[in-house]
Structures are given as C-alpha cells and as structure tokens.
Swiss-Prot record:
Name of the protein in question: Regulation of longevity by E3 ubiquitin-protein ligase
Pathway: Protein degradation; proteasomal ubiquitin-dependent pathway
Description of the deletion phenotype: Increased lifespan, retarded growth and development. Increased survival rate upon P.aeruginosa infection. RNAi-mediated knockdown results in increased expression of the transcription factor ets-4 in the nuclei of intestinal cells, which may further result in changes in the expression of genes involved in lipid metabolism.
Zinc finger residue extent: RING-type: 16-57
Source organism: Caenorhabditis elegans
Encoding gene (name): rle-1
GO biological process: determination of adult lifespan; nuclear-transcribed mRNA catabolic process, deadenylation-dependent decay; proteasome-mediated ubiquitin-dependent protein catabolic process; protein polyubiquitination; response to heat; ubiquitin-dependent protein catabolic process
Amino acid sequence: MAPTGQGGQWQEVLCCSICNRHFNETFLPVSLICGHVICRKCAEKPENQTKPCPHDDWKTTHSPSEYPNNVALLSVIFPRKQCMTLSGAVSEAEKRVDQLSIQIAKFFREADSERGGTVSSREISRTLQRKVLALLCYQWREVDGRLKTLKMCRGISERVMIEIILSIQSNTHVSSQLWSAVRARGCQFLGPAMQDDVLRLILMTLETGECIARKNLVMYVVQTLASDYPQVSKTCVGHVVQLLYRASCFNVLKRDGESSLMQLKEEFRTYESLRREHDSQIVQIAFESGLRIGPDQWSALLYADQSHRSHMQSIIDKLQSKNSYQQGVEELRALAGSQTSMLVPAYRYFLTQVIPCLEFFAGIEHEDTSMRMIGDALHQIRILLKLHCSQDDLRKMPKEERRGVILQAEVPGGMGGGPGGSGGAEAGRIGGLHPLYSQIDETGRSISRTNPKDNSHNSPQTPPKQPRQKRYQMGIPPNRMGYSSDAPPFIPSHQQQPPPQFFNSQHLPQRFRGGRQRGAPPPPPPQPMPMLIGYDMPGAPMMQATEVLTADGQMVNGTPQRVVIMQSPTHLPGGPVVMIPQQQMVPPPQSMTPVGGPMGPMGPMTPSIPVQVPPNTMWTATSPTGSVIYPAASPPGQPPHTIWIQSTDGNMFPMFDRGSGGMVWGPGTMLRESGADAEQLLAKRYEILKRLQPSEDDDDPEDGGIGHVSYTVASSVLDDRMDHHPLTMIPVPTIDLPAIPISFANMPTEETMTMIGEMVQNRPRAPSLTAPSSNQPMNVNASASATVQAECGTMSVMDSICQPISTSAIHNSATIPQPVIPMVQVPVQVPIVPAENFNPNVPPPPPPPQGQPMLVDSAIGLLTPIRPILVAHPQNVVSNSLDKIVDVKERISEAQGNASEAENAHLRMELRMAESQMAHLDPYTKNNCLLRALQQVDMELQQLHLNPTVEG
C-alpha cells in the first residue's frame, strides 16, 4: 500500500521518509518501488544505495540516484509552476506518464497538519484518495513498480465502479433486500446490540469445548437475555445459531434417537474470530444475492458506527471473486441500456461514458508492463476520475439544483468539448455530462468547475427550482394541460378575442419534463401567495356580474366586499389568507359556458376568457360566473369542477367550491412535478399509512384534558401569555349588551379593594369550570387567582372570546363577612389592552359599527372547539409536512455512513421539525387531509403503471 509508514499517516507524502524534510526545488521527491518517497539528497547518499527505504526491504535493479523525480507531488506543492522542467524523463513514453500523473495530481491540494506535508482532496472519497496517492508514489522505472501501478489502476477502477453502483441504488432498499435474503436462508440479524450479546453468550457457553444440544443452547440464551430484551424469542436466537451453523463454526455430533450436539471449533473460540466469521457469512449472502454494499454502510448496518470500515473492507476484499469486477460492469451496462429503468437521460449518458473505461481494466493483462501500457492505464484513470467527480458533484448538490442541472443536460449528440476543440474527443466525453463541465483546459481540468459563471454564455442557465414543499398535488393547472405559457395573463375587455385552440400540435411549444420551454428565461422567484377561505354569511346579495377582489379589499367590478387578511399561524411559509363570504351565484351566461359544455364526458379543453383586472392589482379572485375550467383531474375529496385563478405572473391556481362553505383558494394547488419518481411516491405513501394507523395515544379521547371544554374556557380566560398569540380578524355581527350598573360607575374605595383582595386570597379553588352558572358560587384558591389585578385595583381583561360567558358569583369569606358582589357579563368585543388607571370622567368608547372586524385570539391549543378557522388551509400544511419528511428521510438515507455526527444531528432536527408541523391539527382534519393525500399518491402511482398495494 502507499506510504503507510510515513509518520503513521498515508496522506503525508510531501516530506522525506528518511530526513523528514519537506520537498521543494532543492529537496526533490523521488519515489521508491514500495511506494514511499524520499528526497533527492537522501537518494544520492552511498549508504542508501542498497537499502534506500527504512521501512521495507526490496531488491533494486537501478540505483535510487537514477530514479526520476516525482513531478506529480511537486505539482501539488507548486501548482502554478511548470514542473515538467524538473522531470528526469528521457523517452516520450516517460514524459507522457509524467504529464498524466500531473493531471491526476490536480485532484489533491496541500493541507495543513501538525507535521506538514499532508495532502487532501475535496473531490474524491477517502478510499479513492488512498489508492490514487499510492498510484502517484510508485516508481515506474522499475518492473515491479510498473506491475504495482497496473494493479492499483485496476483497484481504482473497481472502487469507482462500486461507488457508482452505490450512488444509483437506495440504501434503504438495499438494507431491506439484505435482511430479506438473510431471512430467506433461515438466518436473522437482530440488530447490532442484541446480535452482539447473543454471540457473546454463545461464545461464553461453548468456549471451553462443551457439547450442548441446539435447543438447550437456544433456551439458555433466551432466558439470559429476557430481562434486557423482552422481545427475544427462541425463534430469533435459533436463527442466529443457524447463521453460525451455516458458516461452519460448529462440530456436530449426531446421536441415535436424540438431538445432535454442537461443539464450537477451536479456531472460533475467541470473539474476534467468531464475529469475523459471522460477518463474513452475512457478506457472502449479500454477494450471492447480487447486492453491492460499501464498507461504510456495512459498518453502519452491523455495528451502528463507522469504526469498523477497515474490518469490513478486508472481508469484502477476501470474498470478492475474480468475476466480481466483470459482473459489476455487466450490471452497469444492463442498467444503461435498459429502457424500463428509471434513470434520467443525463445519468444514462454518464454510464455510457464510464463503461468503456471500466472495460479497459477488465481485459488488461498484467504481464504487459511496458511504458505504453502504463500511459494508457493512467489515461483511462484520468478520464474515469473526472467523470466520476463530475457526477459526484451532481449528487452532492441540493436536490432542487441537481434536478435543474439534469433537466438542462443536452442530448448526447450535441455535446462537445471546449472551444476550439480543446481536449479533443476526451473533452467531449467529460464535458458532455452536463453544462457545468462543458469546457476542459489544456491541463484537463474543467474550467466551469471552480467558476460556473465564466461559462454562462456557452451553457444554458439553470432555472431556480421550487423547493419540494412547494410541489403540491391538488390539481392540474391549465398551463400543464397544453396552454401556452407565453400568453399574457390578463388582457383588457376590449381586446378579448375568442379563445384559440391550443391543443393543435403545431401550437404546442417543446418542453422539458419540468414544463418550461427550452431556452426560455428562468421564472421569477416565488412570492408569498394569498389564500381565500369562504364562510357562511346569511342574507348575501345575489351576484349578478363578475366581481374581482384584490388582496387589499378594493372593489374592481360589482359591489365592495368585506375582505379581511389573516396570517395563518400554521401556514408555512405562505402569504396572507383572504376570506370572502359565500355568494349566491347566478348561472353563467351562455357566452361564458366552457366550450366543452357542462359536466359530462371530458372532451377537448379550451382556456377561459381572462378577467379584466387593473394593472396595480397583484392577485385577483373571480366568482364562478367568470373563468370556469373543467380540469382533467380533480383534487382528492373535492367536487370535479374547479375555478381557476390566474396571477399577473402567469401562474394558475384553482378555487374549489365547498358547497355551503364558500370558495377555497390557496397556493397548495400546484401540481407535483411530472418527474417525481416512484420511489418518492412510495415513500410518501408509506408515511401517510404510518400516520393513519391508530396509536396508543388515541385511546384518550380527552387528549390529557386539552380537548375538554373546561380546558378551553380556562385557557381563554386565565391564560396570560401574550408574547406568541397571533391575531385573526373575523367579521361577526355586534352583540348588544346591557348598560353597566351605576354602582360600578365610580371608583371603589380603598377599604373595598382591601376586603376584595383578602377575600380572593382566602377562598378555595373552584372544583370545575365545565358548566358555570349565574346562581352557582365559584370558589377560587389563592394559588391561582381567577382575576388579574393591576396595581390600581382594576381588572385587566387578558383575552376575549366569541360568545359571552356567564360567570359565577364570588362566595363570601368565612372569616370576613362581605356581601356577595355580582359579576357582570364581559362584553365580547373588548380589545386586549394593558392595565391602566380607571378615569370615571372619560366616557366609555362607543360600540363598533355593525360588521366591523374584531380581534380574536387564535393561538395554537386555545379555544380550538369554537374557532371557525384555526388552520387556513390544512391540506397545504399536511402536504408541506409530508413532502419535507420524505425529503429529509431521503437525505438521511443518502448521508448514512458518509456524513458527520453534526450533519446527522442537524438532519434529525429537521425531521423532528417537519413531523411537528401537523401536530397542531385536530385528528379529524389531519386524517381527512392524509386520506386525500393518499388518494392523490395512489393516482400518481397508477399513472406510472405501478400498483401501490404491491410496491408499498
């Protein structure tokens, strides 16, 4: 292997193994056959001519002073210098090898360390770094060095192939397939901790050479572990014993008429040897099942850590057969040529470029150790690493940017190299992957790799992708059903023309999967969207004409409406919610009827006539007498008709008729991208089904008392948390209340306030607040006062509710005689105000006019049963939460074994935040929204010709 003896760190290759000096123009690096590097001064010393390496013994055929300089390591130290001038290459083949080595060394950079002389790379994995450094440190002047170089090239290509396969397959699916294959052979893995305890108990029982029957061994292990693992059973422990039996760890002694005895073999009577054989058997089962699993994932699966990667890598290397490499190449070729695979075209084209490089090393002959073969092998390694790094950068991108790059990837026939033919055919192979790697300089490095903006004139710009939680599944907007996206969203009424037929093929623009025309400029960034929530209002006038309402409540056509803007406390991160009263709709005129006719069999669809809108309006909402379009797919759980609303930026959003509930319109109606793969849909379906299953917490109908009416009333009256209560404005009719009694018109005396305070402190707590009445006395304990007393002695109303509350009379104290003071009804429309001194000279404020909006507390968990609108659009909340949960879990699966503990903790925190978004929804609403989302997911899976019940 490469410099393992240099200070105990294989990365420290920029200093001499003998004198520890850092390489420079004076102390030039010289590679040895074993892979260690010394300086030119030490190589020329007489005592080092016979044994130049202090760590390894090997025979030399040339004097170390005749070895050429390692210009690849010099290029890492001096990246801006022409290091080829320091090369000692003589022939053209040797110069070619040096040039290719310099280009491969560009993947590394000098890093800071305690000793110095360390290199690192941000582009290739740690395992590849070790192999590539070993390749750069071999001495190709010797025959043994050239043989090691060819073997290392084969190892690098094999590692790249494994990483490509691991990047294609899903870690979750691979692990499930692995354990299914293990169970199919009568074996079982119980988890890292439990499996470890079972193996240690088996070893403790049999390490002295005892012969025990299998059933007795299983029963002993079960009884011992029953206290720590209640789920342990004879079946699962017997499967673990079967796994060891399959690995030939026992000597079986058969007896006539009785059960056989098992004796542990001598070579497996230590835990390390037994565990290694146990792990080898599981890896062998994976190989037999055709599964490719990396050492980092093996360490995570079997040990739940990353400290056993070397242990698992040694097992993998030992069990790999000579045909494993060729089998992997055949798998990639079959995947690239399959028409039924779910690979995007850009990735399929990437595989077609990688497979020839892998096939080169599949048929390489190690007997040919000429310099020409070394040059060809390094040339293929350089191409393979660049292709792999480019695709690896694509995988490390955020998912939205990655999809944008994949969608912008050009057709393979139109891909070429850099300008002026720089790089030749090889530049075309590397630059043809996607636009970020479209130019290769004279050193073979991608120009756009470090600064993608420099190549913006040659590659199309990547459009800003919408985040995953913005892709909803609530309908199909018209611009995804064949409508022209370049038409103006609104036109004046005097310029309205008959709707053209956009379903003619010659009028349809060519589109990518994302729905945007090729070469079109990227859409503007999304803005917060308002939402319309309808509610019942008696006595609504007949709407005779099309009415348009803006977000600020201004009237466009018709009569003005009472529009109130409400910021939903749960809508993430949407815009304001707009509520309009339900209207009695007049049947639309004949001219406004859709071309397709009334509801019936779906026929060719035509766009509706746009609505007249002033230029200063941002969002408009129209009644059903305006634009009515019957889409091909209705949202789940909604009537089949939809009223589409178009914004000034061309986006279309549907408004659903909820019958007596008015009209509902929100941003949660955009269609999921058509490129959503089946794996994400299945993952989302699994999340929905998991949340629809009844849990143990559902047994308590009162939810710990939170859903009880007493909690609702008490929380609304007694809760004084004012820092996080969002306010909603709901217009309701004003309630006339009786006048305040004369006795309360004057300021109470100090003696009266003192007696009231003592009475409040001495009275006991009321037993219940469920059904207070005016004739029932209410006793309150001094530990939790029922009123909030200010310094001046007046009470400050901390909250208000939508209906008057009949309060109880305060009972007389047992020690201080005091007449009963009746409590008046608190008016509904008392705003939240701070405590201040009462001034009897100031008249009370006049009552608000009829229909004026009032302030209502809509904090989460308070007054839930009597809130007409607690969540503006619960379907959006559920869709946002599900999409984010699936996205975060997929990122956690991708980061398994590769990310740091801090990144994993951050992902787990994101998952908890995503799962908490639905916590404030009541169970009935949440289940309804989940059922609608499940129906939509099943419909999309059916469109992909997948059976949800089978795939799920």
